[in-house]
């Protein structure tokens, strides 16, 4: 970053300052249905047609489409009768609602929830606490009461998490051979995408999603196919209620929500419940040991500040938490993607 070129003209600083504009362009195009319309049409469409079908102004849509072209989310063909737009392949795969790898729901969660919390990042840094109260006018003392403040918000969050596991789930579940573990509890399993991937990869296992009652109800009714008999549900709060015996406990993006004290409390209960020879699989975005990256994880850790009571950690920090609970033979696997895997054995 400190090259002579950067010092003469701070291009990278300008890129950083425009970062939130880039995000909002993508979020807005998703929300308005630009990518879905172009996928469904099966052919490039003109500005006038896109604006008319999506009920927007021509002037506003033109600028949005051109920005998407600049970001390589759309491609444009200049014809005699004007500009015609189509999706790029990456948009077809990840930004349309109907794609199996769609990230639409997490985009909407970021746009409507995360984006608003980050407006108060300065306050979060000053105070060292999340910003639900400022962003939404609701108490943040009950973290998941705030996060699941309405059924619509809860569904948005759960569907968003499911979308992440549609592209990252296989990597974290195959980082280790989990076939010896036949009875698995997915603590805080939410919308069930990771559980579904687990029973697909390991057909001899059963997975029980352990989550709050209202989460379980939504997952049962709207997110997990009823014909999938290898997935069961357990309603409860794992900080207050008992954890049943099992061979393996999956905690995916759970510990990063909490401070070290709460993590030690939860892992101690998991260790008590775990069968001898069993284990716990942590799925988290790992910081490098010198905390110099990855930048995505550093940003996620700030997001934990504005939204939760937790933080992202290094592999050593997670290993120490597991060791304090009694787990041994801790192994770490970096996937090269957003989320990594840490396995501890009893």
From Swiss-Prot:
Gene3D superfamilies with a match to the protein in the record: Vaccinia Virus protein VP39, Winged helix-like DNA-binding domain superfamily/Winged helix DNA-binding domain
Residues of the active site: 256
Residues that coordinate or bind substrate: 257, 303, 307
Entry's Gene Ontology BP terms: lipid metabolic process; melatonin biosynthetic process; methylation
Pathway the protein takes part in: Aromatic compound metabolism; melatonin biosynthesis; melatonin from serotonin: step 1/2
Keyword terms of this UniProt record: Lipid metabolism, Melatonin biosynthesis, Methyltransferase, S-adenosyl-L-methionine, Transferase
InterPro entries: COMT-like, O_MeTrfase_dom, Plant_O-MeTrfase_dimerisation, SAM-dependent_MTases_sf, WH-like_DNA-bd_sf, WH_DNA-bd_sf
MF terms (GO), sorted A to Z: acetylserotonin O-methyltransferase activity; protein dimerization activity
Substrates-to-products reaction catalysed: N-acetylserotonin + S-adenosyl-L-methionine = melatonin + S-adenosyl-L-homocysteine + H(+)
Residues spanning the membrane: none
Binding-site residues for S-adenosyl-L-methionine, renumbered to this chain: 148, 165, 211, 236-238, 253
Source species, domain of life: Eukaryota
Keyword Methyltransferase: yes
EC number of this enzyme: 2.1.1.4
Tissue: Expressed in pineal gland and retina.
Entry similarity comment: Belongs to the class I-like SAM-binding methyltransferase superfamily. Cation-independent O-methyltransferase family.
Summary of subunit composition and partner proteins: Homodimer.
Purpose: Catalyzes the transfer of a methyl group onto N-acetylserotonin, producing melatonin (N-acetyl-5-methoxytryptamine).
Record-given protein name: Acetylserotonin O-methyltransferase
Species for this entry: Gallus gallus
